[in-house]
């Protein structure tokens, strides 16, 4: 047997090679699982702290106000009314299936100066989606957001903050920058109150923060949006007392170069997001 074949198959012949393959199979499957689900660890606070661009850390004098899980006709209009009264704008991460049912709400969001962004098509766990579903659904949601709002969306936030490899690639192919949050209100929890929401947000509130709240109970208990709504005036007031302006992600200074340049750098492995990702998970930037 030629030497290179002996090395490839093993000196014990094909049977020995098969035994080696069987032994390596669990390790290979584990590596594939890590490749798929590894990015999902980004929802954990220690990981997000190592990925400031992904977490949404922005300008020091600004706080980005963001809402997930809408639009819902029973709650989103109330948030829009309150934001109008407060003179604030925000970014709404919408679900495609809800925007499809209530496009008028999407138009109102944009018409009142807020920003639409992509939260996916449905509020499912990205880690258990069959192959290809996330790519199709993220693309479908992005197209709908653009059709309703008249502006190509810039941001993607996965449900539960679980950023699978497929979701990451699908978002980037659509020119969407994945962004999570630096602080949330835990407004979906049973027993949440305006006071608890404000206290939870305030614990991590500082310049450059991205705040996550919910304008819908689509993925939580009925009425769970009320504490967040009632906490808004005090939250905006607290930001003002800290000398911080409140607004959408588009005004937050997240990320680096314009989208076209960023996309080109992503594909050659040199975008800010890619470098941070590599630094966090491999200890290198790939330069």
Locate the predicted segments by residue.
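Active-site beta->alpha N-cap acidic-glycine motif
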Residues: 41-127, 133, 137, 144-149, ...
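A short acidic, helix-capping loop that chelates divalent metal ions and anchors anionic groups
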Residues: 124-129, 187-189, 218-222
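Divalent metal-coordination and catalytic microenvironments
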Residues: 68, 83, 92, 116, ...
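Charged helix-capping and loop-helix junction motifs
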Residues: 131-138, 192-199, 225-232
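N-terminal membrane-anchoring alpha-helices
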Residues: 2, 6-55
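Active-site beta-loop-alpha junctions enriched in small/polar residues
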Residues: 70, 95-97, 121, 158-161, ...
């Amino acid at each position: 047997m030629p030497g290179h074949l002996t090395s490839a198959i093993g000196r014990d012949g094909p049977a020995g090679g098969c035994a080696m393959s069987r032994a390596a199979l669990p390790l290979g499957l584990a590596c594939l699982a890590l490749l798929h689900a590894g990015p999902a660890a980004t929802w954990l606070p220690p990981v997000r702290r190592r990925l400031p661009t992904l977490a949404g850390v922005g300008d020091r004098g600004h706080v980005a106000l963001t809402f997930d899980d809408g639009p819902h006709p029973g709650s989103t209009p109330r948030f829009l009314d309150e934001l109008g009264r407060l003179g604030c704008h925000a970014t709404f991460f919408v679900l495609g299936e809800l925007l499809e049912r209530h496009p008028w709400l999407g138009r109102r969001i944009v018409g009142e100066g807020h920003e639409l962004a992509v939260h996916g098509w449905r509020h499912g766990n990205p880690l258990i989606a069959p192959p290809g579903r996330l790519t199709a659904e993220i693309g479908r949601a992005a197209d709908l957001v653009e059709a309703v709002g008249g502006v190509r969306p810039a941001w993607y936030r996965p449900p539960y903050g679980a950023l699978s490899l497929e979701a990451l690639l699908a978002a980037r192919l659509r020119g969407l920058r994945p962004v999570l949050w630096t602080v949330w209100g835990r407004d979906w929890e049973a027993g949440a109150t305006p006071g608890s929401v404000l206290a939870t947000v305030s614990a991590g509130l500082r310049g450059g923060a991205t705040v996550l709240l919910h304008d819908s109970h689509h993925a939580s208990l009925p009425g769970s949006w009320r504490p967040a709504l009632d906490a808004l005036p005090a939250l905006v007031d607290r930001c003002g007392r800290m000398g911080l302006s409140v607004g959408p992600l588009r005004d937050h200074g997240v990320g680096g170069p314009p989208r076209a340049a960023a996309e080109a750098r992503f594909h050659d492995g040199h975008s800010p997001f890619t470098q941070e990702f590599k630094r966090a998970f491999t200890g290198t930037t790939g330069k």
